[in-house]
């Protein structure tokens, strides 16, 4: 218990960094610029990234929890009255991470354990009542914990509803490349 093995590929990457590293100075508060640009290209693709111009920013965080906490702090400062809507079920850390930043948390129906399917009609009915300025947290792919992902048509319907109702979609994309592939797993991100 408490022993996380280090994979051979991680050891190889660490060796490569050790051989090529030229300084031990700190990186800036946003993280490593080259890393951030590579992540942005992987997430958005070259064409969308180019069209976004200066309307996006990439910040390196200490893991997924760190990124979610940074996002929660940003949301609270930008819109302290916003409610963040999370799926039922959602990853066990979503509610405490977002709630500890002082955000209001509500849930929307997502998964039916008896049929092993997404409760999409119920989800849309609930999200149609979300207030303008609220945020809806979606899992980009490999939904944690149920594994049931939205299809393209469902993503399209959510986009249309978000535009109509004025809520912001907030996507947790922890597993890009592990579902349908690197490109397929970012359909929702690139759509929205």
Language model segments and positions:
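A short, surface-exposed helix-loop junction/capping segment
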Residues: 18-20
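Conserved Walker B
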Residues: 173-174
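A structural motif shared across PLP-dependent enzymes of the aminotransferase-like
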Residues: 1-16, 27-41
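Conserved core of the PLP fold type I
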Residues: 22-168, 177-178, 183-190
């Amino acid at each position: 218990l408490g022993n996380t093995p280090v994979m051979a590929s991680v050891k190889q990457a660490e060796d490569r960094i050790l051989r090529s590293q030229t300084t031990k100075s700190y990186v800036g508060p946003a993280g490593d610029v080259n890393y951030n640009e590579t992540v942005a290209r992987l997430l958005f693709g070259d064409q969308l990234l180019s069209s976004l111009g200066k309307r996006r920013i990439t910040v390196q965080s200490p893991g997924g929890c760190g990124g979610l906490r940074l996002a929660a702090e940003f949301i609270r400062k930008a819109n302290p009255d916003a409610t963040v809507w999370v799926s039922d079920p959602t990853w066990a850390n979503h509610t405490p991470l977002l709630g500890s930043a002082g955000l209001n948390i509500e849930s929307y129906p997502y998964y039916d354990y008896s049929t092993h399917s997404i409760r999409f009609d119920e989800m849309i009915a609930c999200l149609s009542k979300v207030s303008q300025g609220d945020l809806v947290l979606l899992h980009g792919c490999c939904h944690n914990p149920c594994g049931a992902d939205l299809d393209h048509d469902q993503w399209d319907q959510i986009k249309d509803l978000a535009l109509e109702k004025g809520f912001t979609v907030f996507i947790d994309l922890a597993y890009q490349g592990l579902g349908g592939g690197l490109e397929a797993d970012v359909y929702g991100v690139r759509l929205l």
